[in-house]
């Protein structure tokens, strides 16, 4: 496994990371074993945006006894309300949800405290001088979180955050298809309904390309989410390119963008872990 410095955090993270979103699909013992298997393969960074109790419990149990082997991205503002995920800045939900994260992960610290899902300039502006941001900064000062990051799908908002000096790293959606989309595209809607490209569109979205360079310039490390576009790029009928890409191609694309330190892949099986980790030994 190769490791890269994650921007200003100084953390040496594995190029192949772990996106925890799919853990709740499977029986708890299988998911715990899968996460431990990934650790044995050298994977040392996991994103836990998920607020549901099952996912958090799995991660906590999998890390028990080897917490120091994992860097955790834990999110402020991802909450579980009435059995549903709700993104919010309301402190009556934010604080208990973060405390729940610590409890279920069986840890007294989170390596990277993530400002969750900031996709509009309005949302970014509203964070300034907010109780939400004060809470994040307070957790940093108290050592409960060691670093501050942010997750976003929008290059304009991300650029504002990078230039602000607030964040040390960015969780951003990077894949060959998303990088050709016009800015402002609703990626959640796109993943639900499929890709619809203007036939005249060609080449990378310059705002996204500029963001990667900006992150490199400001030493804000990038970890990659949605590197496979939810698996759609592996299906020629759902891929906007008309051909199926391979995991290896998507991983290579993400890891060769400026500023990128790690791609956080979702896994259902040990074989999928092996397939992703095999990138490290693949020839150019």
Question: Can you annotate each of these PLM segments?
Answer:
Residues 1-74, 141:
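N-terminal binding-site loop/beta-alpha segment at the start of enzyme catalytic domains
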Residues 118-284:
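Beta/alpha (TIM)-barrel catalytic core signal, keyed to glycine-rich beta->alpha loops juxtaposed to Asp/Glu
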Residues 6, 18, 46, 59, ...:
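Conserved, mostly hydrophobic/aromatic
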Residues 25-38, 89-106, 152-160, 245-253:
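Short, acidic/polar
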Residues 7-10, 40, 60-71, 102-108, ...:
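Acidic (Asp/Glu)-rich catalytic clusters
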Residues 100-124:
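Active-site groove signature of glycoside hydrolases
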Residues 19-29, 79-95, 121-125, 234-244:
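Active-site mouth loops of central-metabolism enzymes
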């Amino acid at each position: 496994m190769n490791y890269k410095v994650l921007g200003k955090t100084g953390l040496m993270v594995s190029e192949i990371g772990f996106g925890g979103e799919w853990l709740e699909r499977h029986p708890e013992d299988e998911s715990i074993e899968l996460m431990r298997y990934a650790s044995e393969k050298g994977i040392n960074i996991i994103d836990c945006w998920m607020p549901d109790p099952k996912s958090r419990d799995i991660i906590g149990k999998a890390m028990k006894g080897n917490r120091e082997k994992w860097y955790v991205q834990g999110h402020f503002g991802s909450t579980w309300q009435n059995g549903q995920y709700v993104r919010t800045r309301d402190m009556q939900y934010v604080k208990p949800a973060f405390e729940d994260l610590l409890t279920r992960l069986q840890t007294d610290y989170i390596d990277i405290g993530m400002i969750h899902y900031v996709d509009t300039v309005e949302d970014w502006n509203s964070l300034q001088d907010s109780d939400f941001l004060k809470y994040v900064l307070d957790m940093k000062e108290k050592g409960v979180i060691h670093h501050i990051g942010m997750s976003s799908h929008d290059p304009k908002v991300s650029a504002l955050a990078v230039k602000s000096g607030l964040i040390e790293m960015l969780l951003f959606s990077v894949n060959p298809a998303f990088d050709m989309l016009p800015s402002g595209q609703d990626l959640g809607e796109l993943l639900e309904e499929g890709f619809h490209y203007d036939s005249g569109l060609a080449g990378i979205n310059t705002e996204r390309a500029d963001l990667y360079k900006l992150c490199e310039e400001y030493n804000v490390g990038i970890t990659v989410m949605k590197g496979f576009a939810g698996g759609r790029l592996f299906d020629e009928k759902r891929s906007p390119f008309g051909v199926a890409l391979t995991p290896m191609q998507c991983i290579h694309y993400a890891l060769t963008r400026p500023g990128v330190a790690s791609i956080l892949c979702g896994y259902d099986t040990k074989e999928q872990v092996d397939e992703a980790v095999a990138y490290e030994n693949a020839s150019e």
